[in-house]
Amino acid sequence: MTMESGADNQQSGDAAVTEAENQQMTVQAQPQIATLAQVSMPAAHATSSAPTVTLVQLPNGQTVQVHGVIQAAQPSVIQSPQVQTVQISTIAESEDSQESVDSVTDSQKRREILSRRPSYRKILNDLSSDAPGVPRIEEEKSEEETSAPAITTVTVPTPIYQTSSGQYIAITQGGAIQLANNGTDGVQGLQTLTMTNAAATQPGTTILQYAQTTDGQQILVPSNQVVVQAASGDVQTYQIRTAPTSTIAPGVVMASSPALPTQPAEEAARKREVRLMKNREAARECRRKKKEYVKCLENRVAVLENQNKTLIEELKALKDLYCHKSD
């Protein structure tokens, strides 16, 4: 037992000495490793494909070549795809922008056209107003109109119109209409109708004018018609038409016979057309029913004829039978 314990003590002492020496060697190796790290350098003949060779100088002066464990990175076999930058043009946005530009230009053109045109509401208000003055339509004057020379004033003779009843109608430049009978004195039988808005217009246009009678009543009539109020209070409309210059002297225009207002005439014509259409439909229906009735009668006659034939044959047979029995 004593020998075993002594051996154990010796082993433990040796282990302690060994540990102390290892610690001392480790402490001494640290500056040596630092020295080696300072002295070490890569081999000059090392290439990228061969492993790196490092020269290590020991403390005793010996030099040792150490191959590096860390190898240089080899080029990868997998190649990364080439990235190409593609510029995509947005067609939809360009079309939208083009449409927006077109809409802006269209709206500008429409605004310019509306600014050039006269105000239709203003014209309607002027026509519906009771003011005897001539309405004015303000329009933008073009450069050609502003640069046009001065217009000379020409005096036009007063036109005289004669109706089929013998009345004379004179229209002055101010828009007044004077009426005179053929058999009466010119001063006593003179009637004046004041027409507003009697300005000259372009041919082919229809202008409604106000005709003022002697009692102060205003009537809206077309520019080519004349309204005449008789002594009894009846108002008649005369439509003026220009006759050929070969038959009548210039300045004299014949007027047609008094015409009914257009609206009642159109209403009467429409009613007449409706009545005629209904009559045609009724006559067509009557003819159809008549044909059906005649056909039915013909069928009945044919049936009765067949029955009559059968009865005649039966009568003959009975007569023959009676004759045979009597014999």
From Swiss-Prot:
Domain KID: from-to ranges: 87-146
Positions of crosslink type Glycyl lysine isopeptide (Lys-Gly) (interchain with G-Cter in SUMO1): 271, 290
Gene Ontology cellular-component annotations: ATF4-CREB1 transcription factor complex; axon; centrosome; chromatin; ciliary basal body; cytosol; euchromatin; mitochondrial matrix
This protein's UniProt keywords: Activator, Biological rhythms, Differentiation, DNA-binding, Isopeptide bond, Nucleus, Phosphoprotein, Transcription, Transcription regulation, Ubl conjugation
Residue numbers of Phosphoserine PTMs: 119, 128, 257
Pfam families the UniProt entry points to: bZIP_1, pKID
Biological process according to GO: axonogenesis; cAMP/PKA signal transduction; cellular response to fatty acid; cellular response to forskolin; cellular response to growth factor stimulus; cellular response to hepatocyte growth factor stimulus; cellular response to insulin-like growth factor stimulus; cellular response to leukemia inhibitory factor
Subunit structure and binding partners: Interacts with PPRC1. Binds DNA as a dimer. This dimer is stabilized by magnesium ions. Interacts, through the bZIP domain, with the coactivators CRTC1/TORC1, CRTC2/TORC2 and CRTC3/TORC3. Interacts (phosphorylated form) with TOX3. When phosphorylated on Ser-119, binds CREBBP. Interacts with ARRB1. Binds to HIPK2. Interacts with SGK1. Interacts with CREBL2; regulates CREB1 phosphorylation, stability and transcriptional activity. Interacts with TSSK4; this interaction facilitates phosphorylation on Ser-119. Forms a complex with KMT2A and CREBBP.
Protein family membership: Belongs to the bZIP family.
Function comment: Phosphorylation-dependent transcription factor that stimulates transcription upon binding to the DNA cAMP response element (CRE), a sequence present in many viral and cellular promoters. Transcription activation is enhanced by the TORC coactivators which act independently of Ser-119 phosphorylation. Involved in different cellular processes including the synchronization of circadian rhythmicity and the differentiation of adipose cells. Regulates the expression of apoptotic and inflammatory response factors in cardiomyocytes in response to ERFE-mediated activation of AKT signaling.
Protein name as it appears in the record: Cyclic AMP-responsive element-binding protein 1
Organism of origin: Mus musculus
Origin organism lineage: Eukaryota, Metazoa, Chordata, Craniata, Vertebrata
